Amino acid sequence: MTPILSLRGVSRTFRSPRGEVVALRDVDLDVREGEFVTVVGPSGCGKSTLLNLMVGLMEPTRGELLYRGRPSRGINRDIGYVTQADNLFPWRTALQNVSFGLDMRRIGTSAERRDRARRLLARVGLAGFENHYRHELSGGMRQRVNIVRTLAYEPKLILLDEPFGPLDAQTRLQLQDLLLTLWGERPGTTLVFITHDLTEAIALGDRVVVMSARPGRVREVVPVDLTRPRDIFSIHTDARFRAIYDRVWAHLAEEMKEAV
């Protein structure tokens, strides 16, 4: 089966008056349709740059990116992107934020778009908060709105750049559990998820991509052979989880030493 997304020898160099910085070098990666891929690596290894290339916010300096087997250039509107900052429009209510992507794509009637947004908010525990503005929502609530805003128009590939990074530990666990549930309800949806948290990467992913120190490349891809559905609150007690964690950490620790 053709991967939904492929990177072939992708490199990205940033140029400035002070010289060149090679963020990524010769990245080869296939992402299969319907899988959950997590990405870890030392700070500054180009993880966010990788997602920006995937969605088309920037072009590779060298190499090729394929979407469903065809060269992809420019912004790919088939791909959803959830950032660490919630980026909610402060002048729009939660309901209006969720319906934004539907409005831009003119999906359904206005009433149908509002109804879908309302149902999604209820699905993530925000019934009754439809008319609240960003400043009236907690950080966890904002990120729930941010996630379902992307899910609303049903992209087949969703990129997530440390979406739970700023949140407290308990809220992170709750949203990890919610994300797995929402993904499980959408067969065929593919997720690529960046995180600094190895426990999060293993608990969520089908595979963990370990990036090298800058310039970033794929050092190792570690399969996560844990059954689904997963209990996010207890999976870390599984002996198999510990073995996978140790394997991922061994690769990452070496790269962190290189980055110092």
Question: What does each of the following model-derived ranges do?
Answer:
Residues 132-135, 153:
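Conserved signature/switch motifs of ABC ATPase nucleotide-binding domains
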Residues 1-4, 13-26:
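A short, flexible loop at the N-terminus of ABC-type nucleotide-binding domains that lies
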Residues 63-75:
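Conserved ABC transporter NBD signature motif
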Residues 55:
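Helix-to-loop junction immediately C-terminal to a conserved catalytic motif
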Residues 172-187:
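Helical segment within the ABC ATPase nucleotide-binding domain
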Residues 40-42:
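The feature captures the beta-strand-to-loop junction immediately N-terminal to the Walker
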Residues 92-100:
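Short coil-to-helix segment of the ABC ATPase nucleotide-binding domain corresponding to the Q-loop/switch region
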Residues 103, 110-129, 180-181:
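Conserved ABC ATPase "signature" region
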